[in-house]
Amino acid sequence: MALRGVRPSAISAAMRTDEQPIRISLFAPNGRMGRAISAAVVEDPGFAIDEDHGDVMIDFSSPTGLQASLDRAVSGGIPILIGTTGLDDFAGRRIAAASKDIAVLQAANTSLGVALLSDLVERAAKVLGPEWDIEVLEMHHRLKADAPSGTALALGDAAARGRETKIKAERGRDGTGLKRGEGAVGFASLRGGTVAGDHDVIFAGPEERLILSHRAESRMIFARGALAAARFLVGKPAGVYSMRDVVEAL
């Protein structure tokens, strides 16, 4: 018997029992993160890849593929995790529009460690006074196309939240007359080798420094974090979610 007004995929997701694996529909499954997530699914019997009848869609593609993945998730009535970085304000508006119909989790980094780092950065920025300058240093592999990394920018946003202000970003300083702006958050990017992702948030105060760091040794940490986010999204009402919500639900 068909249920009027409910998409078939939404019905199947609602009927899934706790004993059945969560079905992952991968957008761009042949990308680096797509392959890593497929490998993580093989490790975890609680998940399965099902491109046609997914309970959750995961998109780690590119900004140009965002609209197609959102359309596919909305038409299927399933939640979506967006791990794509380098998105602009227009992409943000498209995500907000989709979140009226489905649950959307956007994360520049799906590592659970980075989610905790973000909380620590916000806390440190709140506790330490304005005399502590904040710098974000990140390094990634030679093939990464965007800079600063989405994670670095998200950590800068966390610092701004702690200071209860809007971020004043200073990126890639080069030249002369570049005295640090009051209340600025500086960003520096390094590229080389096969580095999966290094991030340091430096709080430089009077005669002391606090450095909060995270080192990603493999893309598998992002893949496992993406599966944790997918598990969180199953059954969630329409709206926008974050990795902080995932960590708080653990």
Regions found by a protein language model. Give the residues of each.
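Extreme N-terminus of proteins, especially the signal/transit-peptide cleavage junction
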Residues: 13-22
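N-terminal amphipathic/basic-hydrophobic helices that include classical n-h-c signal peptides
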Residues: 1-14
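Rossmann-fold NAD(P)-binding glycine/threonine-rich loop
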Residues: 70-71, 84-105, 115-124
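Rossmann-fold dehydrogenase core element
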Residues: 79, 94-111, 129-134
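C-terminal substrate-binding/catalytic lobe of Rossmann-fold NAD(P)-dependent oxidoreductases
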Residues: 23-54, 64-67, 130-250
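Short, structured coil segments at secondary-structure junctions
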Residues: 45, 76, 98-100, 183
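Short, ordered loop/turn segments at secondary-structure junctions
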Residues: 85-87, 109-110, 139-142
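Beta-loop-alpha module in the N-terminal Rossmann-like domain of NAD(P)-dependent dehydrogenases
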Residues: 57, 61-71, 75, 86-91
